[in-house]
Amino acid sequence: MSLQNLKITFHLDGTGLYYDPYEPIHLDALMSWALMPFHRQKGDEAPTRDSVPIDVPLPLGKWHINGHWGWNASALFPEGETGESLQFWRKKFRQNKIEVTQGSPNLQNGIYREYNNPLPLLLTNKMVAYAVGDRGRVHQILRKHIRYLGKKAAYGKGHVLSVDVEIINNDYSILKDGKTMRFLPFSDGIRQVRVRPPYWNNFEKTACAEIGDELSILK
């Protein structure tokens, strides 16, 4: 496997994606999600937050910091002109349907649950990430499996039109201009999170720096 410095560009349809800069999408998480079905057996129980996760092998380089290791893959960032908005996703119980229910409907849980959730909408045509990896394999995985980014894909948000993977001179997978490009272990960090996928899992959580923190000591 030939490892090279890469820039990955996701070209979007411009209708926006639900992107939270405080909980950003990581490139290695997308690739791990895409390949996970090939590493699970039929009938396996669904993983929980506290179960020991599968480390899906990826065609990427690895970093080692403070006794931890992870993949040379950054978070995703918007590139070019952008706009921001806040949309609310609402669901209300239809009062004219109350006669088809038995008893009093539970509006807090279950099928009658009401909600009014704000979601940050990012308007952009491009999302980019950086990695050290095998260009051909990275391109193949992303082109074949990643059709949407972010939440509400079923409603057409975050639609990926195409993916470009180009070779670049510098490694920006973990640091760029002295600032972190992904979650990295840092003893003074306030975020408790895993340093490789799945990031939602609790196993081996550790203190990490926030994306954009200045950590030139890690150069």
PLM regions: where:
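RNA-interacting cores
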Residues: 1-219
